[in-house]
A protein has these predicted regions:
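Bacterial Sec-dependent N-terminal signal peptides
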Residues: 1-24
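C-terminal functional modules
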Residues: 24-35, 53, 361-362, 368-495, ...
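Extracellular beta-strand-rich solenoid/capping regions of secreted or surface-exposed proteins
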Residues: 118-126, 138-152, 163-180, 186-203
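Acidic Gly/Asp/Thr-rich repetitive segments characteristic of extracellular carbohydrate-active
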Residues: 84-130
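Right-handed parallel beta-helix
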Residues: 150, 155, 159, 175-186, ...
Length: 562
């Protein structure tokens, strides 16, 4: 190529529209304006509820449950005396959730109004425990945004097949939030609302357990930072999420409609992510979004395409311990990404040379690669475009774990079996969508709908993966895997409307005609009776839950509520 031709090409490239190279699509102004208006209106509504509830917030603060939206250190938020529930572990272990508050029963699948999940989350201020007496799909038209702190959402209480939140995002913009056995599958492909299934602006004391998060258009589930506006004319402050745990949870099959089939962005201060499954996400499995100690233990990562675990910055500390990596059909097995355990980033350093954070990586299995499995630093930890950490190894490699919350640790092989047997929203039951994901991880064979070769699904014009990638697990539209299943269930009888079925109350010596017994404690162990019901805790025997040796998942062991 001569110099004149090169200059012509360079000129064309310089003045070409940015959309030619854009990773993301252009959003029509009218659609963006409509989406922004929708979010603004929802925020104004929630703000009005919070303003009306100032007296309630002040009263809770007097009784040891203050509202602290500016929390930025683990010590900024008070900690409960006993775990959020038996089996809660990690950084979020001592979140209060809704303990001691009112019991709200979801009885409607509608987007908003009396008896809805939105009303329980957005329309109520004060500590609350949310239970379900309805089964089915909750189809949202706008995101649910939780601002009022101290809430427990107990998806395991739904009858029959349980519930699934669909259509829009579920945002946590507060602290002291406990969520168990919920399904968040957004499933929409609107260009103006490319957002997570489950995320938000989480402040801290977050405990997520046994949830299923799928079909997000940005990511499936992300918890790592929150933006705090001090309302004094300054710009928003970016603060870490503090005291956060995500355990026993699925992040799978993010939508690749716009090259963004991403699993999660995670992090914060005093954070723990253990016994989870990332499957069929092109990237961010997960990505690390903060520079605190990142504790990633006993997880399973399957069928990534261009990114496994990566992120952080030059000040980050990583505990990558006993995880199981299983390349899938879309993982480039002959490239460095095919056996990548971790790729730390050096971002935000203003030094004139590259600096990376410190890494403790040990006990991780890379299926199909004995060398990396034997020594995780033999190509498993990579920086820049290198096949390993190269000359940075000595400064990065740490031989002992960084300080982390105490919880039991399995081997990587044990964690593979445990995760596949236990992960996700499996009470009242594991649904067919989760079953298919688990089966693919086990066998390598993806489920997809036959006869779609001639169907035109929208795909971003610059999409990286092949059009038929859905046949190998990474999808652009939920119709490629059959969409939402049907959820059925018969409501239980709850005469006094206290969230506990009459049958359970009678079997456990409580009065089905006395709503006040829900917030009492029949054994004096610290868990209220409604907590005993939703977590399958004994009503006959007092257990010292302050003793960590007694901390086991009572609900998982029983496998059901009644």
């Amino acid at each position: 190529m001569n110099k004149k031709t090169f200059l012509k090409i360079l000129t064309v490239l310089l003045f070409a529209p940015m959309s030619l190279f854009a990773q993301y699509p252009d959003v029509p102004k009218d659609l963006k304006a409509a989406a922004d208006k929708m979010i603004d209106e929802e925020n104004r509504y929630v703000d009005s509820v919070m303003t009306a509830g100032k007296t309630i917030l002040a009263n809770e603060a007097i009784h040891g449950k203050p509202y602290i939206p500016w929390a930025a250190r683990p010590t900024d938020l008070p900690q409960a005396r006993i775990p959020s529930f038996p089996g809660a572990e990690g950084g979020g272990q001592f979140s209060f959730g809704g303990r001691g508050g009112k019991v709200i029963t979801v009885t409607s699948l509608a987007d908003r109004g009396p008896g809805t999940l939105r009303e329980a989350c957005e329309g109520t201020v004060g500590a609350r425990i949310v239970v379900f007496n309805v089964a089915g799909i909750i189809r949202l038209k706008t995101p649910i945004i939780i601002y009022a702190p101290y809430i427990t959402i107990a998806g395991q209480t739904a009858p029959g097949d349980g519930v699934c939140v669909a259509g829009e995002s579920f945002w946590v913009n507060t602290h002291d939030v406990v969520v168990r056995h919920m399904r968040f599958r957004r499933g929409e492909t609107k260009v103006e609302r490319r957002d997570d299934s489950f995320g938000g602006n989480p402040v801290g004391n977050i405990m997520i357990d046994h949830c299923t998060c799928m079909w997000g258009l940005d990511e499936n589930i992300s918890f790592y930072r929150h933006m705090f506006n001090p309302q004094d004319g300054r710009i928003d402050e970016k603060l870490p999420t503090v005291n956060v745990t995500i355990q026993n949870t699925i992040s799978a099959q993010a939508l690749d409609t716009y090259n963004h089939a991403f699993g999660s962005t995670l992090g914060g201060e005093n954070c723990s992510f253990m016994r989870n499954l990332w499957a069929n996400n092109a990237g961010r499995n997960p990505s690390i979004g903060w520079n605190g100690i990142f504790n990633f233990v006993n997880n399973v990562v399957y069928n990534w395409a261009n990114r496994s675990v990566d992120g952080g910055d030059y000040t980050a500390l990583y505990n990558i311990i006993n995880n199981y990596y299983k390349p899938g059909a879309l993982t480039p097995k002959n490239a460095p990404i095919g056996h990548r355990i971790l790729k730390p980033e050096s971002g935000r350093s203003k030094l004139g040379y590259l600096v990376f954070g410190r890494v403790y990586a040990n006990g991780n299995i890379m299926e199909g690669n004995d060398a990396v499995t034997k020594d995780n630093w033999n190509g498993g930890v990579q920086v820049e475009e290198m096949e390993n950490a190269g000359q940075y190894t000595d400064s990065m490699r740490w031989n002992t774990p960084f300080p982390k919350p105490e919880f039991p640790i399995m081997t990587a092989k044990e964690s593979y079996d445990f995760v596949l047997n236990n992960v996700g929203a499996n009470i009242p039951k594991r649904d067919i969508v989760d079953q298919r994901i688990i089966e693919q991880v086990r066998t390598g064979k993806a489920y997809y709908k036959e006869g779609l070769d001639s169907v035109e699904f929208y795909q971003f014009k610059h999409r990286r993966l092949a059009k038929d990638s859905y046949k190998n697990g990474i999808i652009t539209d939920i119709r490629q895997v059959g969409g939402y299943p049907e959820y059925k269930g018969t409501p239980y009888i709850d005469t006094d409307k206290d969230g506990m079925p009459d049958a359970w109350e009678k079997a456990n010596g409580l009065n089905p005609n006395d709503a006040s017994d829900a917030v009492k404690d029949c054994t004096g162990d610290g868990y209220t009776n409604i907590e005993k019901y939703i977590n399958a805790i004994s009503t006959k025997k007092k257990v010292d839950w302050t003793n960590t040796k007694n901390n086991y998942d009572t609900l998982a062991k029983k496998g059901k509520l009644m």
